[in-house]
Amino acid sequence: MAKLSKRVKAFKAKVDRTKAYPFDNAVALIKECASAKFDESIDISVQLGVDAKKSDQVVRGSVVLPAGTGKSVRVAVFATGEKAGQAKAAGADIVGMDDLAEQIKAGNMPFDIVIASPDTMRIVGTLGQILGPRGMMPNPKVGTVTPDVATAVKNAKAGQVQYRTDKAGIIHATIGRKSFSDEALKSNLLALIDALNKAKPATSKGVYLRKVSLSSTMGAGVRVDQSTLAA
């Protein structure tokens, strides 16, 4: 904890929390202070102008980041017949039906994402209490319930991230790693921002993208000047 405290103090000494930094400067600060012995993730928080308590203003979806996430993703798929073969060919790590459901009920879940063909939801629906709390329950809104399981698998493997507003109307997502170039991080950030703009609820009023902040796994946040995010 002592090392963490020193690092946090050093970070706070360099960052003006009342200031919004140009994107390049924000990334430079974060990378400079990301001194952990592993390749820290670069995370984004976006404060949206929505009332997350209203169901019609919940922003939820997914987007494939052009530069990926830097993470190896393991995918499980519920499918049968031809679709099962397509999922395997696309790179799915596990494909099954009742056998996969029993594996999940037993607590054996060596995967990060679950994808399901619509006709398998009679089985998948019984797993809500297990998959739901882990954020892995398939949902058509994020593209994980789909007849095109092959494309869903490819997207997941290519660096697709899911997003959803929390109770405060904030989106949290990972846009890469410390080892990524600034250009790669920016392309990923812009892809996410574009997806959020397209998902803007019709009932949202006033400023929609209120605040954008970046941080590393072990670091504090740096606010980003949105005017510097032009492609």
Swiss-Prot record:
An MF annotation (GO) of this entry: tRNA binding
UniProt key word Signal: no
Keywords: Repressor, Ribonucleoprotein, Ribosomal protein, RNA-binding, rRNA-binding, Translation regulation, tRNA-binding
Record-level GO cellular component terms: cytosolic large ribosomal subunit
One GO term (biological process): regulation of translation
Statement: the UniProt record of this protein carries the keyword RNA-binding: yes
Function: Binds directly to 23S rRNA. The L1 stalk is quite mobile in the ribosome, and is involved in E site tRNA release. Protein L1 is also a translational repressor protein, it controls the translation of the L11 operon by binding to its mRNA.
Matches recorded under NCBIfam families: rplA_bact
Annotated family: Belongs to the universal ribosomal protein uL1 family.
Binding partners and assembly: Part of the 50S ribosomal subunit.
Protein's recorded name: Large ribosomal subunit protein uL1
Originating gene: rplA
